[in-house]
Amino acid sequence: MLKVNEYFAGKVKSIGFDSSSIGLTSVGVMEEGEYTFTTALPEEMTVITGALKVLLPGSPDWQVFMPGEKFFVPAHSEFNLQVADATAYLCRYLSK
């Protein structure tokens, strides 16, 4: 079953699904902008196209992730993103 999600007045959209090979996952696109997300489960984010500038929980420095690169966000935390150009991503929701 597909679940369509929309955030930040439509500037971030994703389609969630449960994959037998990789588990609970969403794939989406972020338009240019700055965003703050919170997590319920641990997340593995992979950039597909574009780039994400990320401030991870507990980190004093922003990091840039390019296509094929991934980062991890702990459960029950908040992280910030800066997007300079439309960027596609894959998000895997990891077990607790």
From Swiss-Prot:
Gene Ontology CC: cytosol
Annotated signal peptide: none
Superkingdom as given in the UniProt entry: Bacteria
GO MF term (any one): uridine phosphorylase activity
EC numbers on record: 2.4.2.1, 2.4.2.2
Protein name listed in UniProt: Pyrimidine/purine nucleoside phosphorylase
Protein family: Belongs to the nucleoside phosphorylase PpnP family.
Reactions it catalyzes: a purine D-ribonucleoside + phosphate = a purine nucleobase + alpha-D-ribose 1-phosphate; adenosine + phosphate = alpha-D-ribose 1-phosphate + adenine; cytidine + phosphate = cytosine + alpha-D-ribose 1-phosphate; guanosine + phosphate = alpha-D-ribose 1-phosphate + guanine
InterPro entries: Ppnp, RmlC-like_jellyroll, RmlC_Cupin_sf
Xref: Gene3D superfamilies: Jelly Rolls (2.60.120.10)
Keyword list, A-Z: Glycosyltransferase, Transferase
Function: Catalyzes the phosphorolysis of diverse nucleosides, yielding D-ribose 1-phosphate and the respective free bases. Can use uridine, adenosine, guanosine, cytidine, thymidine, inosine and xanthosine as substrates. Also catalyzes the reverse reactions.
Glycosyltransferase among keywords: yes
NCBIfam families: PRK10579.1
